Amino acid sequence: MTKVGLSLKRILKFGVYYGVADKLPYSVTAGFGPTAKRVRRWAAKDLFEHAGQRINVEKGAWFGSGRGVSIGDRSGLGLDCLVMGPLTLGRDVMVGPRCMFISQAHNTGDVSLPMTDQGMAEDRPIVVEDDVWFGAAVIVLPGVRVGHGSVIGAGSIITKDVPPFACVAGSPARVVKYRGSEGTPSVS
């Protein structure tokens, strides 16, 4: 059976994560926060397809069964983050609070049928390369690849691929500068 297959261990970890661990205090909360972080990591890591070293899964993060979700070393899911469908986070990825990664969509092409009867489209996985920072409340849509070293401004909606080292912002997001470049507007 694969790691993401059904097993007693997975069922128990699922129950512990969604029944207890995801409700524990934010990891930087004085006192119990660091312990809560370790409990969430312990409960969540076996649910993911891959979990690297020192991952962080914050309070309220929702990732379904974890099927198709891979998190690289020193990366994590922020406070109240939502993952719907396959997602790969590289190494050293910071995800701010309330970000959404949505790799699922509904079929809408048949105008003779109500959209509720058209079912789901095939998942289009989201890939986030290494060393990326997502500000708060970013939405990433199906099939997007976010390039190495990028910075995504708070509240941005990512509808297409982001080049390496780009700083993007807006709805839909657009490149406002590249990291390391001088004399260009900064993301605020």
Predicted regions and their residues:
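Conserved catalytic segment of ABC-fold P-loop ATPases
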Residues: 147-150, 163-165
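A transmembrane-helix-recognition feature enriched in membrane-embedded lipid enzymes
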Residues: 2-55
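Acidic, glycine-centered active-site loop in nucleotide-sugar glycosyltransferases
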Residues: 164, 169-172
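Flexible, glycine/small-residue-enriched loop-and-beta-strand segment within the central core
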Residues: 34, 38-41, 61-71, 76-144, ...
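Short helix N-cap motif at coil->helix boundaries in the Bergerat
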Residues: 160, 177
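A generic "structured core" feature
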Residues: 90, 133, 151-153, 157
